[in-house]
């Protein structure tokens, strides 16, 4: 045990007992009344267990990302409408994630602090994943309401519930790392989370082409989602609940007293601050919250366009079709899963190199520039295998986006309001997607109507994000 500036007699006996038991390092601040415990380093497997459930959640998210445009195009959506369907996921995230952060900051029960939300979100996500791909198979009226048929309306409401539940299940993993990992290990912990995220993406993206390969039908009657996609969602739902249950059982969260001592929080002052509202939190947010948020705006706008238009882009440039009912379009849909899996591999490999950079900022810039080159190159490539290079480069940007923003932000925060700040920070993920989705149809017309042109737009947005990184400072403000 290491003592800075004082003897053990300075500290309360209960504090010393916990310190001895848990092998904390005690750091004395300006006076003997203010102290902080930095918890001993976690083992690799403890950090792995913290994030393992994220693997299953990310499979669900990957299935949603790779197949939503395909599903709604199959149900009859016009290409210029596709970006509007993508407003729903980030909109729900912007509403749900700050609430989960706020509520879980105030939740202390036998099951834990963040874990109850994780479990509820996973259960709801599993149920919705069983229904969403069946939207076209159920007997709905073909009568249009606001230009959408019954199947599309069912799909829309299913998408709302799916994304809400995924957000509820996803957010606690980020918070638990912030809660339970010391500053020295947070970069490693978020890198493990990034690895599991990309591994889950890899599996989820490949599911449709795998099920097609083993003989499950990849085509279906007009307006019906193919069985290969349905089975992808079914198996993804099973893996999701198993992975979340693993983390739920393996991880034990801190109790309120231990958490306060770990983060150096004065419980009395925290009680006085409990009524602090969102505006007050934003007013006292560290500078990194805003500067990294600006980078996030450009990055997530770019990836929203990738998720929305990749299917239509390669169906046109590689398979030469824009007919959503055609075999070529469905083959392109499967290949999108392969390309996104390649992106996940690129992310996993690049994540190993990110710690080698001298600073987070330089890693951030290089990663986003490589991703921009990958996006722009899609416009010029007409061979399905050559696109592997493009998506490996895109994977570099994705690796940085998953790990670096949260590392920089959580290192700038104290333990107080950790969940609320992370929930609010996720608005920097959701808001740009809403804006990009809302204007996507207009931008598509401005660039000539070819969906592949939106990949160039995505590349330009990433270059803007790389430029914005230079405003980021890594310190507690």
What spans do the regions from the language model cover?
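C-terminal ends and interior cores of transmembrane alpha-helices
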Residues: 119-148, 370-382
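Helix-loop boundary and gating motifs at the non-cytosolic
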Residues: 38-92, 291, 295, 299-323
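C-terminal transmembrane helical hairpin of 12-TM major facilitator-type secondary transporters
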Residues: 361-403
């Amino acid at each position: 045990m290491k003592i800075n500036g004082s003897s053990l007699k300075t500290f309360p006996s209960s504090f010393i007992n916990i310190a001895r038991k848990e092998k904390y390092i005690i750091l004395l601040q300006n006076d003997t009344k203010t102290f902080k415990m930095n918890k001993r380093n976690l083992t690799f497997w403890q950090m792995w267990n913290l994030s393992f459930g994220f693997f299953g959640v990310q499979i669900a998210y990957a299935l949603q990302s790779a197949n939503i445009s395909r599903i709604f195009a199959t149900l009859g959506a016009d290409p210029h409408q596709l970006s509007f369907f993508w407003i729903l996921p980030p909109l729900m995230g912007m509403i749900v994630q700050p609430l989960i952060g706020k509520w879980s900051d105030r939740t202390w029960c036998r099951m834990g602090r963040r874990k109850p939300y994780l479990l509820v979100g996973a259960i709801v996500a599993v149920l919705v994943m069983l229904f969403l791909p069946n939207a076209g198979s159920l007997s709905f009226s073909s009568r249009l309401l606001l230009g959408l048929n019954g199947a599309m309306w069912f799909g829309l409401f299913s998408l709302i519930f799916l994304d809400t539940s995924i957000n509820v299940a996803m957010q606690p993993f980020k918070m638990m790392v912030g809660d339970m990992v010391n500053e020295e290990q947070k970069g490693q912990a978020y890198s493990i989370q990034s690895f599991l995220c990309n591994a889950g993406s890899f599996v989820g993206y490949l599911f449709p082409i795998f099920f097609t390969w083993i003989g499950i039908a990849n085509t279906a009657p007009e307006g019906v989602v193919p069985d290969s996609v349905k089975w992808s969602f079914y198996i993804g739902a099973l893996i999701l609940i198993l992975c979340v249950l693993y983390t739920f059982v393996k991880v034990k969260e801190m109790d309120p007293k231990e958490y306060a001592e770990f983060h150096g929080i004065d419980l009395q002052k925290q009680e006085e601050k409990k009524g602090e509202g969102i505006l007050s939190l934003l007013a006292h947010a560290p500078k990194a919250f805003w500067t990294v948020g600006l980078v996030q705006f450009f990055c997530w706008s770019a990836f929203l366009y990738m998720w929305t238009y990749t299917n239509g882009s390669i169906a046109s440039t590689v398979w030469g079709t824009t007919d959503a009912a055609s075999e070529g379009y469905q083959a392109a849909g499967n290949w999108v899963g392969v390309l996104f899996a390649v992106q996940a591999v690129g992310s996993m490999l690049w994540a190993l190199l990110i710690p080698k950079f001298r600073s987070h900022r330089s890693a951030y810039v290089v990663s986003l520039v490589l991703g921009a080159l990958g996006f722009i190159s899609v416009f010029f490539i007409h061979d399905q295998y050559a696109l592997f290079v493009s998506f490996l480069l895109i994977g570099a940007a994705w690796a940085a986006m998953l790990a670096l923003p949260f590392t920089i932000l959580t290192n700038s925060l104290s333990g107080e309001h950790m969940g609320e700040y992370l929930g609010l920070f996720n608005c920097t993920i959701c808001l740009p997607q809403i804006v990009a989705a809302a204007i996507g149809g207009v931008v598509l017309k401005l660039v000539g109507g070819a969906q592949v042109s939106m990949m160039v737009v995505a590349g330009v947005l990433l270059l803007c994000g790389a430029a914005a990184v230079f405003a980021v400072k890594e310190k507690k403000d």
